[in-house]
Every structure is written in C-alpha cells, then in structure tokens.
C-alpha cells in the first residue's frame, strides 16, 4: 500500500473486540487508537488503504504456470509499505479491502474474468426495499450513477468496475451457489465494457 494513502488519516474499518463506551474511551487514550461505534458497542478503527501492488505476484504466476491451485488475497492480504529508507518492507496497521485486492490480482494475472462471489444473487438497486431490483447486465458507466452500501456492495462494484475498465473483460457479482451459471453468463450481475444480452 502507499504510505501516503489518504485512508491513513481516516480510519474506517472496525477490527478486534467490542468495547463499552467507557472501555473504548480508556483504550483510545492509552493506545492512541481511533475508536468508533459498531453494532452494540465500540471497536478499534483502522485505515483501509487501496492496494497498489502484490509483492508475491511472481510466485503466484509461477505456481499457476506449474498447475497449482493458488489461494491468494484472502481477507485482502497483509498490508505492507516500503521502509522509509527504501530498503525492505514493513507491516502497517490497516485492513486491505479483499475485493479491491482480488481485482488488482486478476488484472495483474491477466485473468479472463473476475468473479466476485457473495451471499446475494446479484447487485440490487434499492436493496432491502419493496422496489428492489437486480441489475443483470450493466457497465461500469451505468454503475457509476448508483449508490451502494459502503461496507458491503460498494467495494465489490468498485472492484469489478476497475477490472472491466483495466482489461476490457467481463466481471460478475453474484451468489457463490450459482458460480457455474455466473461464469456461463446466466446468473449474477454481468458487468462488461458494453452491455450485452444475457445468454438464455
């Protein structure tokens, strides 16, 4: 990650145990942590910087080229920056968004498709409301005109759109249970540079 990413000045991702307000105030004072409400209590907030490179990319490429099934970018990976002297790396207290990291990995590997599997069938407009409707076939430009939930669907949409813009290839967001149909173009929200008709 970039040590100058503006996210470091605006911690937003809750991590760790849940505290009462009194406990959160004490921990914040003692450890100089940002704290914020989360559900029924308070949790530590850390930055969520944008991933800019994947140091293990060559190893991942080599493993793929030699027939390995590679599991990478789980949970977004471990955030690191270059040391101030430019030699070596150091860990930073942050959380990398798993969807943006997966998108970056797919772009760097020149993947044929990015599939973001989740627990809903598609990207919905007006999610949770009576007039909710699934987006079936869309483009990054169309999606830019809508607002999605910050902590759930927004990063998935941003990641899928980044992949489509960078590669000109298709991305899909939908249910893990429908992954084969998503790959075939029969399910999920299909995102491509130009809208197309979903295969029947």
How would you label these PLM feature ranges?
Residues 1-200:
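C-terminal catalytic "cap/lid" subdomain
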């Amino acid at each position: 990650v970039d040590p100058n990413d503006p996210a470091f000045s605006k911690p937003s991702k809750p991590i760790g145990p849940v505290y009462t307000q009194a406990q959160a105030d004490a921990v914040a004072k003692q450890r100089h942590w940002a704290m914020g409400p989360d559900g029924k209590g308070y949790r530590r907030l850390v930055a969520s910087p944008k991933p800019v490179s994947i140091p293990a990319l060559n190893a991942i490429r080599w493993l793929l080229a030699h027939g390995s099934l590679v599991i990478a970018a789980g949970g977004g990976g471990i955030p690191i920056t270059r040391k101030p002297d430019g030699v070596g790396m150091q860990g930073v207290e942050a959380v990398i968004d798993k969807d943006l990291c997966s998108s970056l990995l797919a772009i760097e590997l020149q993947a044929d498709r990015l599939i973001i599997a989740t627990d809903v069938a598609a990207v919905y407009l007006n999610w949770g409301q009576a007039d909710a409707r699934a987006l079936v076939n869309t483009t990054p430009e169309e999606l830019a005109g809508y607002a999605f939930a910050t902590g759930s669907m927004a990063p998935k949409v941003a990641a899928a759109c980044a992949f489509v813009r960078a590669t000109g290839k298709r991305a899909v967001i939908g249910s893990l249970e429908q992954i084969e149909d998503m790959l075939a173009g029969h399910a999920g929200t299909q995102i491509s540079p130009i809208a197309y008709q979903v295969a029947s």
